[in-house]
Amino acid sequence: MAEHSFDVKAVIKDFPILEQKVNNKRLAYLDSTATSQTPVQVLNVLDDYYKRYNSNVHRGVHTLGSLATDGYENARETVRRFINAKYFEEIIFTRGTTASINIVAHSYGDANISEGDEIVVTEMEHHANIVPWQQLAKRKNATLKFIPMTKDGELQLDDIKATINDKTKIVAIAHVSNVLGTINDVKTIAKIAHEHGAVISVDGAQSAPHMALDMQDIDADFYSFSGHKMLGPTGIGVLYGKRELLQNMEPVEFGGDMIDFVSKYDATWADLPTKFEAGTPLIAQAIGLAEAIHYIENLGFNAIHQHEKELTEYAYEQMLTIDGLEIYGPPKDRRAGVITFNLADIHPHDVATAVDTEGVAVRAGHHCAQPLMKWLGVSSTARASFYVYNTKEDVDQLVQALKQTKEFFSYEF
């Protein structure tokens, strides 16, 4: 398979859900930023796990338990390699990006933030990367600061340097905005944070599915992402953390394999990574995530990037031919595969409902980013997003549906 391309028609055949019709129209699924679809290869490994070696992991000595343990720990190694983490202990399986960020806020944050310290975020963050830091700041009487954004929703180096200072203890930032498609230079931001003695926690929910990641190059202290946005199952996420930081952090959930020894009045914890994986682990989900990673790697990130870039630029241009349609965020050549927009005088929920009648699935609402909506001066928006199984035909179907929506709402009854 060519490094810079893949056969999208063959890819589409791997996704059974895309074969169906919605409202008697072909399904154009343009909501992968919320949740991606799942290829048959992932469905098959999940089916195989439950049919052939469903068992708990680590402590069982029987054959099924050993097979399940191998599958689970091999998945951890797959993730480690996928993001080029240095040690397997740095890969913690969680319920998702939100759970991962909350572990950092509660475990690292509570132990390292004091009164008067500063936590730096941006207004483009998902609620899951604002609220945990808000609550930490309240608990510790610390200050939450925001890096200013340009009119296009991007960050300027001078503003980053002006906001992060010696009082900063944590910088929490999205690698890619789930609303604007802004791609932040987290490597540079990490360098600036470290120069001031701060750590950086990166929300990678929208980057891990779409771009090659190298933790040793980025030098992030913590990095979080979810399986369901990258062709994997729901209910599985990853927290990457530098080993030396995780070793000094206390667990936030207790029970199961994270226990080393329990007496009547005290307990000690297992070593990494198990220390942060209380209860029965997400075994099937981790195995499914590993298969999703294999699928992505087989396509290749260069090819994925080129495919999404062409689709996004095409959609951007076609959508702007519609009078009264406004697109938010960076120019077409500086954004990820997401286009957030509004049609003048039509509520985004009406837009999403109307295009759904034409088989087009888009998201409408504040996208868990109410501070950003306020910054944009709107209450909500519609959002289309693109992934490996999308085509120009999907874009054309969206544009035609938007034109019909505009015409319908312009009609005087």
Swiss-Prot record:
Gene Ontology terms: biological process: cysteine metabolic process
Keywords: Pyridoxal phosphate, Transferase
Reaction(s) catalysed by this chain's protein: (sulfur carrier)-H + L-cysteine = (sulfur carrier)-SH + L-alanine
A GO MF term: pyridoxal phosphate binding
Cofactor: pyridoxal 5'-phosphate
Residues that bear N6-(pyridoxal phosphate)lysine: 229
Active site (catalytic residues): 368 (cysteine persulfide intermediate)
Enzyme class: transferase
A Pfam family: Aminotran_5
EC code(s) of this entry: 2.8.1.7
Job of this protein: Catalyzes the removal of elemental sulfur and selenium atoms from L-cysteine, L-cystine, L-selenocysteine, and L-selenocystine to produce L-alanine.
Assigned protein family: Belongs to the class-V pyridoxal-phosphate-dependent aminotransferase family. Csd subfamily.
Protein's name according to its UniProt entry: Probable cysteine desulfurase
